[in-house]
Amino acid sequence: DDYTFDNFVHGNCNEIAFQSAHAIALSCEEYTDSPDTNYSKKKPKASNYNPLFIYGPSGLGKTHLLLAISNYVKTHRPDLSVLFVTSENFTNELIESIRSGKMQEFREKYRTVDYLLIDDIQFFNGTKESSRMEIFNTFNAIADNDNYIITTSDRTPSDLKDFHERLITRFSSGMIAHISPPDFEICSIILQK
C-alpha cells in the first residue's frame, strides 16, 4: 500500500508513463454494471492507453506505477479484479499448471481479470514456444474482453528478442511509455522524501 500515485515523483523523465498509468487507474471509476448484461464495461477515457507498455532501466519506478494502479483500483473498486504478477511468477505458475493438468484454472485466473499487471516482461524471453503462445493467447483474451494489460520491461517491445512478432505487435498496439533516468530536479525531490 506504500505505492501510490501521490508518492510517485514525476517530471519530464517519466511524465508520460505516470499520466498513462494514472489514467488507467482512474478508469476503474468508469466501469458500469448494466441490468441487461451481468457485467458490461465502459472505458472511454483510458482505452487509448491499452495495452500500456512502460519501459526503462531498472530502479526508475516502473514497478511503483504498476502497484499504484493495483492499489488505486483495489481501493476505489474492490469489486474489480486486479492481478499483479512478475513474469517469473507467471511463467512458474504456467509450468506448474501444465505439469499438474490445471490449465483451465490458470486460464480462468489470468484471462478473466479486469486489470492484468505484469512486471519485467523481458524475462519471458527464454520461455518455450508453448509458453509464449499461452502468453499471447492470454493477452488476446484480455484484450478481447476490453480489459487492461499493463506491462513493464527494461527495453522497448521491438528489442524483445525471441518474442513472437504477434506478441510484440500486441505490446505496441497501445501506449508505449519510456521512463528515463531522473534529472537533477527530480533527484532533489526524491532525496527530500
Q: Where are the regions a protein language model picked out?
A:
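Short regulatory helix/loop adjacent to the ATP-binding pocket of P-loop NTPases
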Residues: I95-R99, P157-S173
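Conserved AAA+ ATPase "SRH/arginine-finger" region at the nucleotide-binding site
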Residues: G174-I186
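Short glycine-rich substrate-engagement loop in P-loop NTPases that contacts/grips substrate
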Residues: D79-V113
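Walker A/P-loop nucleotide-binding motif
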Residues: Y39-L66
